[in-house]
Curated annotation (Swiss-Prot):
It comes from Trichophyton verrucosum (strain HKI 0517). One of its GO terms (cellular component) is fungal-type vacuole. SUPFAM superfamilies: alpha/beta-Hydrolases. Residues 1-17 form the signal peptide. InterPro entries: AB_hydrolase_fold, Peptidase_S10, Ser_caboxypep_ser_AS. This is Carboxypeptidase Y homolog A.
């Protein structure tokens, strides 16, 4: 997860005032028009009188302090779209939407629900021998195109190493918002990593050991994805993900009949409740969703933010990072932070959710970040802030930017970056950061099991906060889950049988896991443990 500096305040007014409209340049590349500062003035005057004093003051300060930054210009990624003839398959959403069938009641209905006519899916069969990533394993890459909105989402699919005809299919999503899921592929749970010499190294603990995995770069303008428009909230991104899965399973019906699971980490704590709810809202679908998994997620800020001070001040199982004075200062700031989040929860408006995010992140998160310690692992210093404290990302980025790699994958943008700070900014300043997406989890639990797991050395989405929000969640099984005790989680499937890897509690469709000795990215720090609980979860244990 990537947090913002105050230098990005300048864009708050722009994002809250008006969605970006896109003009088409003569070369076919989308270019955003210049935004007029008067839009900010007019919109501010319209809403300011209705805001609480503290929030109104925040926006007045924005206008005064950052006027010189207005207006701004936002440009899309440079890209060259490949003709359809260069792809092995092109699936038209309009064709799927046009199919009608007769139901058991004799009434005609569409075979598959959802707005799909504006979407296409382009598919390329990847030759593993050209890249050296999981040789012998069937792979596909390509783009989901929203032709109406000029959005193009990149994906890379790996078939299971074990039994692809029967093993489940899993979607993996990294967070940010704005970070590529290829980070998860090459740094965490995918079939290979890239060493400092840009050599491909196989990962024996890959999650495709017993499952087929789709890595998706979303929202648009993340990783190899691109667009002439933008997505700046989680709900809009959910429509794209539903379309991708629908068209993918239509092209590959051999996977559609198998169990499907949606998984991710960090800001995926926002994404997954929305995406799962979107899929489950459709009665007639070819997506066989069976469960959801969220690792070290941000899901319920109101319940999670009070746990930052304990985690940073020695109450999360690791030595304190902050001194007592700073810890007291965080305590003193918490009441106002929570008041702002509560107001955001009540209105879900950017005009109140943005101040909540800016104040809380400054008062509650910034003290830790100023120490130079890794916000994703309280045990280590941040080696390289530009690479999110993980220098390994530099090699991954260099490898993915090789022309031979991009050609083999059918990539249409000119370059790859692991995280797009512009996407992070847009989500934050549209108020998405603090919104109460946890409220969707009870309806999801009515239909499928949900696993919340957390590496216990992470600060930024720490295990204390994830335990707190799962215990506090109001759903029919709330009391039994909250009363359930954490029990030892042990390895059962290999030579290390009996080794403690964490703690687990479960009741009904809800499960929480604390994974020992892991930071924000559990599969990176504890690859054996992550594959252990992942395989057991897919196998139906705990639900």
């Amino acid at each position: 997860m990537k947090f913002l500096t105050t230098g990005l305040l300048a864009t708050a007014a722009l994002a809250a005032a008006q969605e970006q409209h896109v003009l088409q340049a003569e070369d076919g590349h989308g270019q955003a028009p210049q935004r007029d500062a008067s839009i900010f003035d007019e919109t501010l005057q319209k809403f300011q009188s209705s805001l609480e004093d503290g929030i109104s003051h925040f926006w007045s300060e924005m206008k005064t302090n950052f006027k010189d930054y207005l207006p701004l210009i936002s440009l899309p990624k440079k890209h060259t779209r490949r003709p359809d003839s260069e792809w092995d398959h092109v699936v038209r959403g309009a064709d799927i939407e046009s199919v009608w069938v007769q139901g058991a009641d004799g009434e005609k209905r569409r075979e598959i629900d959802g707005k799909l006519h504006n979407y296409d899916l382009r598919v390329k069969a990847v030759d593993p021998s050209k890249l050296g990533v999981d040789p012998g394993v069937k792979q596909y890459s390509g783009y989901l195109d929203d032709n109406d909105a000029d959005k193009h989402l990149f994906y890379w699919f790996f078939e299971s190493r074990n039994d692809p005809k029967n093993d489940p299919v899993v979607l993996w999503l990294n967070g940010g918002p704005g970070c590529s899921s290829l980070t998860g592929l090459f740094l965490e749970l995918g079939p290979a990593t890239i060493d400092k010499n840009l050599k491909v190294v196989s990962n024996p603990y890959s999650w495709n050991s017993n499952a087929s995995v789709i890595f998706l770069d979303q929202p648009v303008n993340v990783g190899f994805s691109y667009s002439g428009s933008s997505v700046s909230d989680t709900v809009a991104a959910g429509k794209d993900v539903y379309a991708l899965l629908t068209l993918f399973f239509k092209q590959f019906p051999e996977y559609a009949s198998q169990d499907f699971h949606i998984s991710g980490e960090s800001y995926a704590g926002h994404y997954i409740p929305v995406f799962a709810a979107e899929i489950l809202s459709h009665k007639n679908t070819n997506i066989n969703l069976k469960s959801a998994l969220i690792g070290n997620g941000l899901t319920d800020p109101l319940t999670q933010y009070p746990q930052y001070r304990p985690m940073a001040c020695g109450e999360g199982g690791y030595p304190a990072v902050l001194d007592q004075g700073t810890c007291r200062s965080m305590d003193n700031s918490l009441e106002r932070c929570l008041s702002l989040i509560e107001t955001c929860y009540s209105s879900e408006s950017a005009w109140v959710c943005v101040p909540a995010a800016m104040y809380c992140n400054s008062a509650i998160l910034a003290p830790y970040q100023q120490t130079g310690m890794n916000p994703y692992d309280v045990r280590t210093k941040c080696e390289d802030m530009a690479s999110l404290c993980y220098p390994q990302l530099n090699a991954i980025t260099k490898w993915l930017n090789q022309e031979s790699v991009m050609q083999a994958l059918g990539v249409e943008v000119q370059s790859y970056e692991s995280c797009n700070s512009g996407i992070n900014r847009d989500f934050l300043f549209h108020g998405d950061w603090m919104k109460p997406y946890h409220r969707l989890v009870p309806s999801v639990l009515e239909k499928i099991p949900v696993l919340i797991y957390a590496g216990d050395a992470d600060f930024i989405c720490n295990w204390l906060g994830n335990l707190a929000w799962t215990d506090a969640l109001e759903w029919p099984g709330h009391k039994k889950f909250a009363e359930a005790k954490l029990e030892d989680l042990k390895i059962v499937n290999n030579k290390d049988k009996g080794k403690k890897i964490g703690q687990v509690k479960s009741s009904g469709n809800f499960t929480f896991m604390r994974i020992f000795g892991a930071g924000h990215m559990v599969p990176l720090n504890q690859p054996e443990a992550s594959l252990e609980f992942f395989n057991r979860w897919l196998g139906g244990e705990w639900h």
